[in-house]
Structures are given as structure tokens and as C-alpha cells.
Amino acid sequence: MSGNTFGALFTVTTFGESHGPAIGCVVDGCPPGMSLTEADIQPFLDKRKPGQSKYTTQRREEDKVQILSGVFDGKTTGAPIALLIQNTDQRSRDYEDIKNLFRPGHADFTYHYKYGHRDYRGGGRSSARETAARVAAGAIARLYLKRYLNLDIIGYLQQMGDLKLQFENENEINKNPFFCPNNKQIQELADYVDRLRRQGDSVGARVKILARGVPTGLGDPVFDKLDATLAYAMMSINAVKGVEIGAGFNAVEQLGSHHRDQMTAKGFLSNHAGGILGGIATGQPIEVSIALKPTSSITTPGQTINTEGEEVTVVTKGRHDPCVGIRAVPIAEAMMALVLMDHYLRHKAQCK
């Protein structure tokens, strides 16, 4: 199985399965001399880890990270940084009844026909459990970008199902389990999730990610445009079905006289381009939105086939998120950080 490594100079290779003994990653290309401890990485993992509230999956993982290499006396050495996270709350028996079935909307069918032999427990390698390793790697990138460039990344929930959230206060985002920027809508979100659980169903979401303090010039045309890399990175996240940069699909209805980001001696007058022109960062905030589908792991019975091609009914018994978009926020932040870190090192290698 190929395709487990991301990046050009700052690379991340993840490994492990949902119900295996552990997951982890190897980060290569981190500059030497940066202070780094497990305690630096842990808060980012705590933000993503399951079982923190009744509104997400009830699988409970501590997600304690171990640094195995690449750090000596509290500083990075420039060598590959290996990170390990133990899986401690697997419940593989939940999947015994469906090991020979293809869950609708999941990778079971495609993994079976591509590889012939798959780990059916919790989706194996295709599970969003893998993203914990991305968040750990992204933490290293975020720490570097913040300390050396004063670059900040923030993500939040924009919409859950048909409930659109009004942006009120950035300080509210990390004070609630929904990463919602409006404390007046928290109860609406809570009621929505409770209703989904009772119905045995799920719903999609829209998440926005912002990066501020991005140096002008990051990005490499033509195939490695910054926005192209961001779209590639975001689409690699489980359940993501769409990516917008800046105005995104709203640009279809805009006139050129409105969409163009006019400039003055003091700077740009708007940011419909989302901080990127010609694939290169303008220095404005980078704005990315992602659309996530509703998870197919629901208790409502559904039609499918088994490995013999016979039609059967399936009910998923595992512990799952009614809305995967909630915990996608820290994952998308991590992918933004990995892209920007990689492009920053590439920019330094080529330009002054």
C-alpha cells in the first residue's frame, strides 16, 4: 500500500490501523534546534481525541504521544522524529457481525477489491483514527510556524446540516465541544446532535480554516500552487467531499468588478482570492473551507452486499460520531500547518 507520505521537504509518513496496537508517524525535514517535548504536542491531540463529550464518538482514547527519536536534550536534531500513540480502547467485537459485509459509504468495498485482504475492524487503515498521527505531526509544524514566523492557524465549525453558524467571537471557538464561534448557538447544536442520536442517523458539516501571518511568496507554480496543495491536503481527510479557497463556489455568481481584490498603497481592499494569487501567497489571511459528508456508520438498517455478492441488510454497531465535522476541525488545522511548513522550507531553499 503506497500513498502514506505527505510533503516534499517537510514530510510526514503515518502508520497504523484503527484497532491495531498503535498508530504513529515519522516526521522528516524538521529543522534542528527547535525546543520540543511531548507536552508541547499533547494539547493539539487533546483537542482531537475521542470521547471528550457526548456529542462525538464514545470511544475513549488518551492519545498520549511518545517521542521516539529526533529530539535530544529537549531540542530537535534534524533527524526523523518518530511519534507513537497507543490504541487502548478498541472494541473489535463490534465488527464481527459485519466483517464479510461492505458497509455502504465506507471504504470496505474498494479496499476489498483493491487489496484482497483488509483489516475490517473499525475500517482499519481507512479509519479516521489515522488522523491522530496527522495532528501530532501538524503540532510540530504549528509550533515552528508560530515560534519562528508568528503564524497562527484557527479552524471552526461553520455549518452542521442545515444549521448555519454566525461568526461572533473567535475566543469562543475552543470553549465548547463544537468549535463554534457563537456561544448563543451551542444549545442548538447540542439539540441537533441529540436528535440525530435518537434517530440513529448522522449529518454533514462545513468547516473553515484560517492562517494569519503567512509570508508573501509561499507557493510553487504551476502544479505545486499553494492552493492546489491545500486542496490536495484537505481532500485527503476522511469524509471531505469538497474544498473552497476564498470565495470558492460563490465566485460563480460574482462579477469580476466585485471579485477582483483591488489594491491600494495600504494593501488589498478585499480577500476573495483567499490569500492566494497565481498559486502564491499574497500575505493576506489564507481562507479554506471544507465540506464533510455525513458518516455512513449509523444504526439505521441499510442495504448492501457481502463478499459473496449476496444482498444483505447491515446495521453498524460501533461507536461513531453523529457529525464527523466536529472533530475534523483540529485535523484540518493540522493539514494546513503541514502544507505551510513544507512550502516555507521549499521557499527558503529557492528564494531569499
From Swiss-Prot:
InterPro entries: Chorismate_synth, Chorismate_synth_AroC_sf, Chorismate_synthase_CS. It comes from the Bacteria. Pathway: Metabolic intermediate biosynthesis; chorismate biosynthesis; chorismate from D-erythrose 4-phosphate and phosphoenolpyruvate: step 7/7. FMN binds at residues 125-127, 238-239, 278, 293-297, 319. Keywords: Amino-acid biosynthesis, Aromatic amino acid biosynthesis, FAD, Flavoprotein, FMN, Lyase, NADP. Signal peptide: none annotated. GO terms for cellular component: cytosol. Reduced FMN (FMNH(2)). One of its GO terms (molecular function) is chorismate synthase activity. Pfam families: Chorismate_synt (PF01264). NADP(+) binds at residue 48. GO terms for biological process: amino acid biosynthetic process; aromatic amino acid family biosynthetic process; chorismate biosynthetic process. It catalyses: 5-O-(1-carboxyvinyl)-3-phosphoshikimate = chorismate + phosphate. This reaction introduces a second double bond into the aromatic ring system. PANTHER family: CHORISMATE SYNTHASE. Belongs to the chorismate synthase family. HAMAP family: Chorismate_synth. This is Chorismate synthase. The lineage of its organism: Bacteria, Pseudomonadati, Pseudomonadota, Gammaproteobacteria, Legionellales. The gene is aroC.
